[in-house]
Amino acid sequence: MDAVELARRLQEEATCSICLDYFTDPVMTACGHNFCRECIQMSWEKGKVKKGKKKQKGSFPCPECREMSPQRNLRPNRLLTKVAEMARQHPGLQKRDLCQAHQEPLKLFCQDDQSPICVVCREAQEHRMHRVLPLDEAAREYKLKLEEDIKYLREEMMKTETLQAKEEQTLTEWQERVKERRERILEEFQKVVLFLVEEERRILQVLKKEEEDTLGKLQDSKASLDHQSRSLDLILLQLEERSQQEPLQMLQDVKDTLNRKESFSVQYPEVVLPAAIKTLCRVPGQIEVLKSFQEDVMPDPSSAYPYLLLYESRQRRYLSPPPEGSAPYSKDRFVAYPCAVGQKSFSSGRHYWEVGMNLTGDALWALGVCRDNVSRKDRVLKSPENGFWVVQLSKGKKQLSLLPNSTLVTLTEPPSHMGIFLDFQAGEVSFYSVNDGSHLHSFSQAAFPGPLLPFFCLGAPKSGQMVISTVTMWVKG
């Protein structure tokens, strides 16, 4: 008996005829056949449900010979347990060496199905027309293919490992660059913070000196006036007392009394009225920060006052044509003032836009934001109560007017380039002179009542021009 046949016989002896696998907890029936304990019990349980067969009480037929065997007579077969365990562990006795269907050695290889088969499988209908090779010949052929694949995969693995190393190096270098950039950002921002602290201290010192210098002049002027006021009070009191005396007493030394009044000369000090605080509220870099919120604001032609002209420089055309006689009075058009609003409304977020101005000597204008539902037909005060948060330039271009109290903000120079910053959530609108980066004024409140629109207004035909983005706006004269 050759080794293959011996292996086949040992596999047969160690194999359960019910599950066709190596024995697990084998037991022997009264008739001498062996089965897995679980397999024979399941077989007998199935037999209970079959009808038409009478069985002795507690006895069941053997699956091999059909001889009745008492269930309680099942005896463990420890020797077969060891044989089955040896068969599991021995490489030459693996179940995969036998055909699962025919329990024959797998000696052939079906190239069509790419699987080992036995001699019985080759004669079966399933494989009869397939290309079949001896197992060893197929193994040699496929071994060459596998070696080629292994060689290719090893080359690919080397490439992958090389790329992996490069990627790891790149990752490390990237993390180092990010770390360096982070440190640089922190360092530069720390420099900016220190610079701003120093600049704040410097500007406050300049303001304090300006305050003290002007305050000293004002106090000197006030002290001089106080002294003269006391002297005048004394002379006035003397004259009043003399005027109430008897005629004789009143006329005695009247010449000296009158000379005292004549000799007193009231010295009116030069009135110190500072036109404007020279120290500007200017934070370095603030305009650049605000420009990160910049919007491309465009005036809405349909909202423009009938004689307010809008000219688009890129397209070289009028957005609101020069009116012939009178322009159409739509519900969106301002008719009481030469005003217009932006095309886009804002109901959240932060927004910044700029307006350039080429104004004349008697310029009148207003800039800011307004509610989207403000009155466009009636003349109303442009105040927050009426839905306007705007600053106005009074005649002479030296004072910004703030409604509703007509508070005046005196300017050192008339602004020719204004920046407007809206922080909707904060309820704040701020105005800046882009020329020198100074802050001019802010409106603050708890919350805005609804969507806001950019607001533009020119006061008269000779007020000059406003430039909003690529649109130039002026009043037809």
UniProtKB/Swiss-Prot annotation:
Enzyme nomenclature, EC number: 2.3.2.27
Zinc finger (RING-type): 16-66
Binding site for Zn(2+): 99, 102, 121, 127
Entry comment describing in which tissues the protein is expressed: Almost exclusively in the testis.
Segments forming domain B30.2/SPRY: 276-475
Alphabetical list of InterPro entries matching this protein: B30.2/SPRY, B30.2/SPRY_sf, Butyrophylin_SPRY, ConA-like_dom_sf, PRY, SPRY_dom, TRIM/RBCC, TRIM17_PRY/SPRY
UniProt entry keywords in alphabetical sequence: Coiled coil, Cytoplasm, Lysosome, Metal-binding, Transferase, Ubl conjugation, Ubl conjugation pathway, Zinc, Zinc-finger
Entry GO MF terms: protein-macromolecule adaptor activity; ubiquitin-protein transferase activity; zinc ion binding
Coiled coil: 135-226
Record carries keyword Lipoprotein: no
Keyword Secreted listed: no
GO cellular component terms listed in the entry, alphabetical order: lysosome
Subunit-level organization: Interacts (via coiled coil) with TRIM44 (via coiled coil). Interacts with TRIM28; this interaction prevents TRIM28 activity on BCL2A1. Interacts with TRIM41; this interaction prevents TRIM41 activity on ZSCAN2. Interacts with BECN1. Interacts with NFATC3 and NFATC4; these interactions prevent NFATC3 and NFATC4 nuclear localization.
Family according to the record: Belongs to the TRIM/RBCC family.
Its biological purpose: E3 ubiquitin ligase that plays important roles in the regulation of neuronal apoptosis, selective autophagy or cell proliferation. Stimulates the degradation of kinetochore ZW10 interacting protein ZWINT in a proteasome-dependent manner, leading to negative regulation of cell proliferation. Inhibits autophagic degradation of diverse known targets while contributing to autophagy of midbodies. Autophagy-inhibitory activity involves MCL1, which TRIM17 assembles into complexes with the key autophagy regulator BECN1.
Identification of the protein by name: E3 ubiquitin-protein ligase TRIM17
Organism field: Mus musculus (Mouse)
Name of the encoding gene: Trim17
